[in-house]
UniProtKB/Swiss-Prot annotation:
Bound cofactor: record note: Binds 1 Mg(2+) ion per subunit. May bind a second metal ion at a regulatory site, or after substrate binding.
NCBIfam families the record matches: PRK00203.1
GO MF entry, a single one: RNA-DNA hybrid ribonuclease activity
Binding site for Mg(2+) 2: D10, D134
Location(s) in or outside the cell: Cytoplasm
Lineage of the species this protein comes from: Bacteria, Pseudomonadati, Pseudomonadota, Gammaproteobacteria, Pseudomonadales
Tagged with keyword Nucleotidyltransferase: no
CDD domains: RNase_HI_prokaryote_like
Name of the protein: Ribonuclease HI
Amino acid sequence: MSDSVELFTDGACKGNPGPGGWGALLVCKGVEKELWGGEANTTNNRMELTGAIRGLEELKRPCEVTLVTDSQYVMKGITEWMVNWKKRGWKTAAKEPVKNADLWQLLDEQVSRHTVKWQWVRGHIGHPGNERADQLANRGVDEVRGIKRA
């Protein structure tokens, strides 16, 4: 039987584009692991995707994952849009290249390793896991901007 893991992810950006950060909180059998990072010039959507990718990458064997995000972009992309993007060779219905296709492809690769249940939550309303992921994403932004946290 594979491990059951909760993964809370978030992205943040100060300016869009601008300095951004991603955060991921993994919870398995009561043990928590915090992950975060950032990029100097990025977008909020890229950071949202990166949080999910990095969280899934951290899992070394196939798991049953409940991935919780406040990003409609990530949620709809993975559960609704991606199937058609792949059929069209990573093009939109308007025959334009899919934005952030590099990250969508990485996410698709990571998702294929696990059994993932996607759950959307409204951001910034006090959901504990989402709030923690948001704090981690903002830590990533601060580190990119050279702001140290205690």
